[in-house]
Structures are given as C-alpha cells and as structure tokens.
Regions:
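Anionic-ligand binding patches
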Residues: 2-5, 11-128
Length: 128
C-alpha cells in the first residue's frame, strides 16, 4: 500500500485531508503519526513557498526511514487575506497575535481593526 505523509501537526487538517484523499486507497499519515518530529521553519514569502519548504524538509527526514523511503510527502500552507489590511494576516495567519492566542481572540482583533470600514471594503479570502 502506498504511503502518503502530510507535513502537518494539525489534527483538524488531517481529518480534511483523509476525507479528500479517501478514494486513493493509500495509507495517509501525519508527520507525527510517521514518527517525524520536526519543527520546520516556514520562512517563505508566499503560501506556496512555505508548503514547498515543509514538504521538502519532511521528505528529507522520511527518506532516511526505511518504512517511508518511498512515501509521497505533501504539504500545504493556508491563511486569511483581508484586502483592507494589505492582505494581513496572510502567511502569518497561524502565528498572528501568537500561536497560543485563540481564534476567537484573533478574530475579535481583526474585526476591531476593521471597525468603521464600509462593508464593500471588507473583502477577504481564505487562501490554500
């Protein structure tokens, strides 16, 4: 059975990935489930660069492990871009206001920053 390692520690993301890839008939593992303990520095300038950095680093480690030598390694990076805020938080979405800050507090801060901004200028997107 083909093995696919997804370069993430995010359990919610793994639920989504397994649902999307369920028809492949492959064993789908998070990097944690594969026993890969790496804290990859996402220092790219774009979502795509960060995904490539993660996939490359995790693949290097997996390639050293006999059970994952031929595994496929996938990664993504995603985040919220708010046009009025010059596409903030963007690639920093996960780290916006600190990684330990709850989404509720982060969202409240973003809404506060948009206070007084007309609805038609409150455009945003989730980039993945």
């Amino acid at each position: 059975m083909e093995k696919i390692i997804f370069a993430t520690g995010n359990e919610h993301k793994m639920i989504e990935i397994r649902a999307i890839l369920s028809d492949l008939g492959a064993e789908i593992l998070s990097q944690k489930e594969a026993g890969i303990k790496a804290d990859v520095v996402e220092d790219g300038a774009t979502f795509e660069e960060n995904a490539m950095i993660k996939a490359t680093e995790i693949a290097k480690i997996a390639n050293q492990m006999p059970e994952y030598k031929n595994a496929v390694v996938l990664a993504d990076d995603s985040g919220l871009e708010i046009d009025y805020l010059n596409k903030e938080p963007g690639i920093y979405s996960a780290r916006y206001m600190g990684e330990d800050t709850s989404y509720r507090i982060k969202n409240a801060n973003l809404i506060e920053r948009l206070n007084g901004v007309p609805d038609e200028k409150r455009t945003a997107r989730f980039v993945c």
